[in-house]
Amino acid sequence: METQNHTTVTEFILLGLTESSTLRVILFMVFLGIYTVTLVGNFSIISLIRSCPQLHTPMYLFLSHLAFVDIGFSTSITPTMFKGFLGNRLVLSVAACIAQFCITVTFGTVECFLLAVMAYDRYVAICSPLLYSTHMSPRICFLLVGASYVGGCVNSGAFTSCLSILSFCGPNQIDHFFCDFPAVLKLSCSDVSIIGIIPSISAGSIIVITVFVIAVSYAYILITILKMRSTEGRQKAFSTCTSHLTAVTLYYGTITFIYVMPKSNYSTAQNKILSVFYTVVIPMLNPLIYSLRNRDVKEALRKAIIRIFP
């Protein structure tokens, strides 16, 4: 009988986006700019909503939490990318890798639930305006936000529980810029036949549930808008939804390709590009989408600028 000696892996090497030192410098500058805009934009949204009484409504409460989640989502990955750009290689311990993935999944899942909550909020505001204060009371808003964070933690716990029971005794190079579940799973020497389908089941279930809420909400919204006789009323109703629909399309479209579609449909390079888009670019775009396409936010921003620079 042959005895195979396995060395337990205690750390992973993340290969990042490129091996070219020149490209790493360029990418560092690009992502530094993106991360700066992400922080400034989302912190500005949070500060603006907190400081402007006219934005103290459920819709903007949810938007402020979305901005906070985008900050956490981007921060869970981008600073680690900077280390990889500035060094020859990025090394993370197994525990640090699992922790990074845990945080990333938490914020990513919370964003899914918040987008669904925001769709429900628009449904109540447009379809049942007289009952809005009752259906979206401070207590209900608190419960909806709290449930979003709890859902994120539960989903993250399921993923990290699977990772924590895996053994790693072979190659330790992850062909990615962060510790994503499929990339880490490839390096395990444990039986992953069951664990390997968990990302699609878990992410797919959350996507189906939240997309169902969003789709039903907007179906009723569309019916209500089409029944409106006033053109101005239609335009106002549409204007409150376009920003949210844009954010939903960008986010759900990307994560569906990554975590639900069969991996044979796209290459590792394409996976990295899509991952960059939803983990780094979208958190930067959300505050721009909501500020540039929202009259209330633009007006509050104008007043805030006047107060600062009279």
UniProtKB/Swiss-Prot annotation:
InterPro entries: GPCR_Rhodpsn, GPCR_Rhodpsn_7TM, Olfact_rcpt. Glycans are attached at N5, N265. The keyword DNA repair does not apply. It is found in: Cell membrane. Coiled coil: none annotated. One of its GO terms (molecular function) is G protein-coupled receptor activity. Gene3D superfamilies: Rhodopsin 7-helix transmembrane proteins. It comes from the Eukaryota. Residues 1-25, 76-99, 155-196, 259-271 are extracellular. Its main location: membrane. One of its GO terms (biological process) is sensory perception of smell. It holds the Pfam family 7tm_4. It is a multi-pass membrane protein. The chain crosses the membrane at residues 26-46, 55-75, 100-120, 134-154, 197-217, 238-258, 272-292. Keywords: Cell membrane, Disulfide bond, G-protein coupled receptor, Glycoprotein, Membrane, Olfaction, Receptor, Sensory transduction, Transducer, Transmembrane, Transmembrane helix. Disulfide bonds join C97-C189. GO terms for cellular component: membrane; plasma membrane. Residues 47-54, 121-133, 218-237, 293-310 are cytoplasmic. Belongs to the G-protein coupled receptor 1 family. Potential odorant receptor. This is Olfactory receptor 5P55. It comes from Mus musculus (Mouse). The gene is Or5p55.
